[in-house]
């Protein structure tokens, strides 16, 4: 059975032996890693361990699987690692294995500790006594990416660069000293601050011109007239406008097209074509249309391309402004019956009706 765990409390070695106990095992190998009290002449007080818990446990379980694939006779495997602060002489890691024979137990534990130092993401920091700063230590067995052999050695190729502080005057926009530049920046910041303050007074403070109270020391925080709206990030009140009268509502107005036709018809004849437009009738009429459509006029351009521009402009206006629908008269579909023609009925007087009835009686209409 595999026992893998990251603990924050001291590791109980007796409990480890209980986990290894098995009637079919004749050997148990236990490795205990402890904190030593010195490193390169410096007094070590304790070690601090940190780990990426989920990945560390995953790698420790993989190590157990590798051990069982190499030594199938192993019965129990224990890998305990401590996290947090570990004082001197206390156990930081315990790796143990039990098997029927001693060779498998000894070799598996040695292999497991090497793999633990190499693969498991656990970091160690040594805390020293005195004025020495604590240091993070890396395992010599850890996998590190090898440095590229083709990396360029800049130290072997010194480059001499001539430093020149002379800048052409054509590249300098502001030719003042530091004091003058600082003064200009301060003036700019103060002016912008005054503009913001004055705008805040206009937006947030009410006018007290007719009030007898003295509000010379008031501010927008204490005398604000605008309150933040609920469920809104803005202090200004926002309303949704329902435009009931406008170009988009023309279908709801029965007399809209009639009124618009009258309005547009009143503008006919107001344009006064110039002398150049009167040179030729087609050119003058086309220029009048281009002028009305706000299109650029070029007399040297082909007339067909100019007509094409006018058509494109009309299509654009029809797509964005429904007011231009009154210019278009859609022809009825051939499948639909033509609308009935309006015939004005003739009005007859009483004398005409009497004469018509008398003719019917006399039979003069049928002769």
From Swiss-Prot:
CDD domains: MoaE. One of its GO terms (cellular component) is polytene chromosome. GO terms for biological process: chromatin remodeling; Mo-molybdopterin cofactor biosynthetic process. The keyword DNA-binding does not apply. GO terms for molecular function: molybdopterin synthase activity. Keywords: Cytoplasm, Molybdenum cofactor biosynthesis, Transferase. It is an enzyme of class 2 (transferase). It comes from the Eukaryota. Substrate binds at residues 101-102, 117, 124-126. InterPro entries: MoaE_sf, MOCS2B_euk, Mopterin_biosynth_MoaE. Its main location: cytoplasm. Catalytic subunit of the molybdopterin synthase complex, a complex that catalyzes the conversion of precursor Z into molybdopterin. Acts by mediating the incorporation of 2 sulfur atoms from thiocarboxylated Mocs2A into precursor Z to generate a dithiolene group. Belongs to the MoaE family. MOCS2B subfamily. HAMAP family: MOC2B. PANTHER family: MOLYBDOPTERIN SYNTHASE RELATED. This is Molybdopterin synthase catalytic subunit. The lineage of its organism: Eukaryota, Metazoa, Ecdysozoa, Arthropoda, Hexapoda.
